[in-house]
Amino acid sequence: MPDNDSHSLKSLPERQREDLFSAGSPSLEARKKQLSRLKTMIVDHEEAFTRALHADLGKPAFESFSSEIAVLLNEIDHVCKHIAKWNRQSRSRYLKMGYVESIKRKRHPYGSVLIIGSWNYPLQLSLMPAIGAIAAGNRCVIKPSEHAPATAELLKKIINDAFPPEQLLVVTGDAQTASHLTAAPFDLIFFTGSGQTGKAVAEQAARQLTPVILELGGKNPCIIDETGFSKEAVREIVWGKFLNAGQTCIAPDTLFVHQSVYEKMLNEISAAVSAFYGEQPRESSDYGRICTDDHFQKVIEFIGQGDVRHGGSYDRSDRFIAPTVLTDIEPGSPILQEEIFGPVLPVIPYTDMRTLLSSGRIQRDALTGYIFSKNKDNIQLFKEHMRSSTISVNQVIHHAASPHIAFGGVGTSGYGAYHGKAGFLAFSYEKQNTEHIITSIFKVNSRHILIQI
């Protein structure tokens, strides 16, 4: 087991690469066995992971299972079912002047991959990339977030006991440890976190020309037009916004509501919050907490930037912030410029879709965009305006749990994608082998007949 000094950490990728090259690229069966072992590890320690997630984020048990554990198990099953098809060699031939060019294409692992997880979903965001990396045949080092220490230490103990370090290793530590790791000569770095830290990781990796996949965040807009209001829509938005106490990178960040349904929407939001979490959400067993003191301070500062329509209470002693709805926010306020990443929902009225989209109030390259509407023209306008890699109509967040949908950002929300086949492709590169087949050409009845010599 390596120490966390700079020299030991920097030697990790070389040791994993040497083992990979000496053993050769793992067979599909070997990869499936590793993934099966990972699945067994998750299932056998489900209760321990649930306790750790509650200790780190106050996560309710069902929320831990549905948003962290179940999605990992589903991903492993999907990958194991389809990996043979994704890994299949393709062939093609092209006629050139005097010869046939034969091309064989096949995916190959990068080698040793570094995965830096985030604290908001510390189990899922540490292991989901690892599933794709293992499926592609790589060796992995996982650095979980130090801001979710219970989950990080549990991951370290369980994985390092179950896997040899040359295959899969968890390294815990602070930001300095992460800096030492990103300076090491890995073949690929996968990072999930803030844009500021993501830039630092990319800059460090660029010094060694190490490719990087960045999964960042952004201000995901959610629009309710004049046709989109319903109690079901409101409940969907409230669930998605306050899941994990708002600490979800694809949560609806700011809600834009057509003026004709604005008051009705506000009333229904309050009713839905009360239905989900009761009149005293601090006492609810279905509501989590903010992860760190610094993030708690940032989120409560947002509350004072508008009129509180619902909620607004907080308690620093256990980092509780009530589900909060804000109205009448001054244009240019920080809450309208920065990613909120907490249980505070600004609700902004608008009167015209085209005017809203051209106003600059909606971040075009957010991680995702949501619209609730029955108006096909409005839906199409929104789709054309957004640069994000996913647009969800009449639902929120569900796409992130599907292995059939690539998950990733555009522009300031990151680059690269994973989940399902996209993960297999992200952690592998295509090797093309070409062969020239010499031919003789005879012209018969105006046709060219190729005869291989």
Swiss-Prot record:
Keywords: Carotenoid biosynthesis, Oxidoreductase. The active site is at E215, C249. Its EC number is 1.2.99.10. Residues 1-20 have a biased composition (Basic and acidic residues). Pfam families: Aldedh. It is an enzyme of class 1 (oxidoreductase). The keyword Acetylation does not apply. Involved in the biosynthesis of the major C30 carotenoid 4,4'-diapolycopene-4,4'-dioic acid, which protects B.firmus from peroxidative reactions. Catalyzes the oxidation of 4,4'-diapolycopene-4,4'-dial to yield 4,4'-diapolycopene-4,4'-dioic aci. Belongs to the aldehyde dehydrogenase family. This is 4,4'-diapolycopene-4,4'-dial dehydrogenase. It comes from Cytobacillus firmus.
